[in-house]
């Protein structure tokens, strides 16, 4: 683990209110999401001397950071926990998975409408519901809808060319409009209307209509039909009982603000159709002397106006600050949306409670952030002492990733006095070298990064070279040959070689390519910050390499599964009604397809899920 998590300092910042917490590992990945009636009491239980299970011990050993979101009630905490688990798919949760390109659920305008996920411009005829936080949330919702309201989700090309119903019909997840006589036009249209109402947040109307139909069927002695509708009613109720819904079904964003020690936190609650979908904290960079009103006004403008093509504005925005140009802001947003957008600063009732909640979350997140910042400062001070530098304000670290020499990617990550500066992370595609030549790759990325004009504020104090003596020698050669206007002698070049068995804490550091290196104690704060930036660089390189490799393959997810050739692909898609139906199918359902064994069904299931 790159850093020792200071549980004692963190717990001092935690409230005793109900809420949800997210635990992160050293790579910034959410590894656990939980809920609590009392956040302080629950989180304190993780750091006792005697833990409940080995799983908890393994979890706690990997904790790098914890974020909390305060909620009004336990019910809200339950909903939020569920949303976060679907979003992050944490490793230590029982799994039931921020996308700038917000996906929608699309209900087509066909004679027999279909449901599908949609991204981008809304050209196709039909209705769009959303936005959803990410693609996984859409797929989960589509799978849920398919179980409750069995309208088709297959591609039109599949739908138009069927002579008999697919497996989705056989297992009760599609009414089979592709084959004449399986479902009446009226029944299919009714199910489509239920979907429309459900996605619009009108769950009560759906239940009212279903109950009425069930009673009518029962009175007409159509007991089988009444039982089917009863099951549908129960399915809808199971879903709606888990959701916290406000008295109004409006769409609104609630923005709370906290400011302390020169740092601001803006916390946004996202509420759609009266349901809390989630929340997020933002920490805008605040120049000295800036008024808080300017921070809020600038943030709101950037948040809604940048990337506006992919962002859907809510009908109302609640602000934790009385802005001088509130009318101007509302008019600008209304013009952008093509409809009236209200910006309110003094709400009442439920809206006032939401604003108080956003304010509480902003203050909690800011307190936690300031505590983390203090820890980073201590580690950088310790590193400066080890390296005999006056201070370390900026560090950059490089790593190389490839597969058997192909699709080589170099990463550069940046840390400043506050820790990771992710907006300045960069990836470089390496070309024109001998496959697998990491030295040439390092040489190339350093020349591209530093062989140009650099602003004085962007000159690093330390450049960390992951790979030991050989890579450090490349860096020294590159810097010796640089012909630049900035002070190329300012950065200290530091090589890092992994220890025996590549275990954290056994790293060897090098100032020069020749001679012996030196090591730091495993509990050294200076070593922790070196491990942290090194791990960030490695993860960033691996992530870039995976994207490049996936792009090069340019094949469907089915084509990558061993044992699934063209005939089996065709059979799977035919019986499941397309790839979406296959993604939503269980192992048992996949195994029913002719030619697919239980073992292959499991392989297909997990390949599509991951």
UniProtKB/Swiss-Prot annotation:
The keyword Secreted does not apply. SUPFAM superfamilies: C-terminal UvrC-binding domain of UvrB (SSF46600), GIY-YIG endonuclease (SSF82771), RuvA domain 2-like (SSF47781). It comes from the Bacteria. SMART domains: GIYc, HhH1. One of its GO terms (biological process) is DNA damage response. Keywords: Cytoplasm, DNA damage, DNA excision, DNA repair, Excision nuclease, SOS response. Changing residue 399 to A/N: Defective in 5' incision but not in 3' incision. Residues 16-94 form the GIY-YIG domain. Residues 204-239 form the UVR domain. Belongs to the UvrC family. Interacts with UvrB in an incision complex. The UvrABC repair system catalyzes the recognition and processing of DNA lesions. UvrC both incises the 5' and 3' sides of the lesion. The N-terminal half is responsible for the 3' incision and the C-terminal half is responsible for the 5' incision. This is UvrABC system protein C. It comes from Escherichia coli (strain K12). The gene is uvrC.
